């Protein structure tokens, strides 16, 4: 059994916006607070700092984090560990009471819909964090369940990477003005760029094309992205460009890979992301990268049970490419991404900003050409909808740079973006007989010129989201405010055992980087092995053995046991096995 040890403080240097947001949060008398901050700015650090301070002021209070996806649950749990917070990312309403050595849990909006009653009890007087709160509107039942599950919470901190609207039903715990969510604190992309060292400037090579296709009604059509089309035909044009039956996408992948090769000369771990339409499309794109460039791309899709493991392995590697489908909007945390290719039919502004957010995260410690600004490139079809979204972000980028450079003229000011009328923000609706749709061909137009133009822009140092749990940012904010946080007391009394809480170097000490849940999983597996051996040695039934081990340890069930109790249960099992032998 591990001996208790002193509590070690966590030192964090907050960015100026985080410090300001924390002060505003502390002065907010209402239970609800909405913070909107651009992806990569450090929303997770802000939220966990706020939670740590609140739990320290309110001993016994639990913390509940609601994340968009299963993958993000584990990222939040690991990020919380840096603050001395133990959160269970595998909580289930069937587990019984939460063990007293856990500060709380991480769940998903989807899980809330099926476990709202259990969560209502767990979250009473709790501190609740909603990561990307707009996901509560993904399903009408989710919003209702969120309200039912968390209306008894003491504090509710909602996070979002971009301002959002509610055109159908209001999201619980969010105030609105003219259908627009009213943020209590907002930190935009332009502000983050102006602050330097927070996010990267992103450049948007927009590739035109000439597409030919047979529409579902049998009509043969041809158009470039400059031609004005209605929504239905525009979607068909985009689908044609993205199809690998044509040459538009392979040429764009060539351009993106060439840019990545250049980047990796000075940033060897830099990587690229392709956002695909579906699983088959993702596999085909990986095939193109393999055949044309000799690289083995990682494919991660939401329906792949091994997707999280693949992403974790890719994050720790220096592999050049990953191809994803919906997981890009679900918080894929890959800080080394510098290149992206938008090859999906999802054309809503929210999804676009989420996708751009995958390449904006600043990487400290880079050296060599481009290290001062760390530009990223996001390759796009020159679809008018995407053109408009990218132009708005580009204007934020240029505005922040003009502020930074005073009266100096922007070298690209004479080359304005062509902003066409949007074709609508609705997601692509497959309400056609798409089985009758077929691609004749697609070719890229002026791809070389577009990429060269954007490369020249970056050479001048100029430039343009669901967030991920991020690094607490120790020692990288020269203008920030340093805070010292002690791990808050556990709900069951006492403080975090340092022997179980310290996060060390995973390479030299893998155990020290494990979360409390991961340690417990190992101990549960060892307990299960001992129980199986006892069944063979004693002739007792499996349930009898388990119940006796629980009795000896003084627990009702394994899922309610603390880490110390699981260690004690294992010791009882080993002693019993020695006697039985």
Each predicted region: which residue ranges?
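Long, largely alpha-helical accessory region at the distal end of helicase-like NTP-driven motors
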Residues: 242-244, 248-255, 259, 380-533, ...
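Conserved helix-turn-beta segment of the N-terminal RecA-like "Helicase ATP-binding" lobe
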Residues: 70-93, 288, 292
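Interdomain helical connector at the RecA1-RecA2 junction of SF1/SF2 helicase-like NTPases
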Residues: 9, 168-269
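SF2 helicase catalytic motif II
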Residues: 119-158, 162-164
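Conserved Walker A/P-loop ATP-binding site and its immediately adjacent core
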Residues: 44-54, 59-82, 277-280
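Conserved pre-motif I regulatory segment
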Residues: 2-36
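Walker A/P-loop
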Residues: 29-50, 275
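Conserved RecA-like P-loop NTPase helicase motor core
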Residues: 296-408
């Amino acid at each position: 059994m591990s001996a208790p040890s002193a509590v070690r403080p966590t030192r964090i240097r907050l960015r100026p916006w985080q410090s300001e947001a924390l002060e505003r949060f502390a002065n907010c008398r209402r239970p609800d607070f909405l913070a909107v901050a651009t992806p990569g700015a450090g929303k997770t650090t802000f939220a966990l700092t706020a939670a740590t301070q609140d739990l320290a002021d309110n001993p016994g209070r639990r913390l509940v984090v609601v994340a968009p996806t299963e993958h993000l649950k584990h990222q939040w749990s690991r990020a919380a560990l840096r603050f001395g917070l133990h959160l269970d990312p595998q909580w289930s309403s069937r587990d019984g009471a939460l063990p007293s050595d856990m500060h709380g849990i991480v769940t998903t909006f989807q899980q809330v819909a099926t476990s709202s009653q259990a969560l209502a009890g767990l979250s009473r007087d709790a501190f609740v964090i909603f990561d990307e709160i707009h996901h509560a509107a993904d399903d009408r039942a989710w919003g209702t369940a969120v309200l039912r599950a968390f209306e008894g919470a003491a504090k509710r901190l909602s996070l979002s990477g971009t301002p959002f609207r509610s055109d159908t039903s209001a999201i619980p715990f969010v105030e609105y003005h003219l259908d627009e969510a009213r943020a209590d604190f907002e930190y935009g992309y332009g502000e983050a760029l102006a602050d330097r060292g927070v996010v990267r400037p992103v450049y948007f090579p927009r590739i035109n094309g000439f597409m030919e296709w047979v529409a579902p009604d049998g009509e043969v059509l041809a158009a470039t992205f400059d031609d004005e089309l209605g929504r239905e035909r525009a979607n068909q044009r985009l689908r044609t460009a993205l199809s690998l039956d044509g040459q538009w996408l392979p040429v764009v992948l060539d351009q993106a890979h060439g840019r990545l090769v250049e980047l990796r000369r000075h940033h060897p771990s830099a990587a690229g992301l392709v956002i695909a339409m579906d699983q088959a499309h993702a596999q085909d794109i990986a095939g193109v990268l393999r055949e044309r460039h000799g690289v083995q791309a990682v494919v991660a899709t939401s329906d792949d049970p091994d997707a999280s493991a693949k992403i974790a392995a890719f994050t720790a590697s220096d592999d050049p490419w990953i191809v994803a489908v919906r997981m890009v909007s679900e918080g894929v945390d890959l800080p080394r991404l510098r290149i992206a290719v938008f090859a999906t039919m999802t054309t809503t502004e929210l999804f676009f900003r989420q996708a751009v957010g995958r390449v904006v995260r600043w990487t400290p410690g880079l050296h060599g050409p481009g290290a001062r600004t760390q530009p990223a490139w996001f390759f796009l079809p020159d679809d008018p909808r995407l053109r408009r979204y990218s132009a708005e972000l580009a204007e934020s980028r240029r505005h922040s740079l003009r502020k930074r450079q005073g009266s100096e003229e922007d070298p690209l000011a004479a080359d304005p973006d062509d902003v066409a009328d949007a074709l609508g923000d609705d997601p692509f609706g497959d309400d056609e007989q798409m089985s009758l749709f077929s691609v004749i061909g697609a070719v890229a137009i002026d791809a070389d010129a577009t990429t060269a133009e954007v490369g020249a822009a970056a050479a001048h140092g100029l430039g343009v989201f669901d967030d991920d749990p991020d690094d607490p940012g120790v020692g990288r904010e020269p203008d920030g405010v340093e805070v010292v946080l002690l791990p808050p007391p556990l709900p069951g009394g006492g403080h975090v055992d340092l022997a179980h809480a310290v996060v060390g170097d995973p390479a030299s000490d893998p155990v020290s980087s494990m979360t409390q849940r991961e340690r417990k999983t190992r101990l549960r597996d060892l307990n299960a092995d001992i129980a199986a051996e006892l069944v063979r040695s004693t002739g007792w039934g499996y349930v009898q053995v388990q119940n006796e081990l629980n009795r000896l340890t003084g627990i009702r069930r394994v899922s309610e046991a603390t880490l110390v109790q699981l260690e004690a249960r294992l010791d009882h099992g080993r002693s019993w096995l020695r006697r039985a032998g």
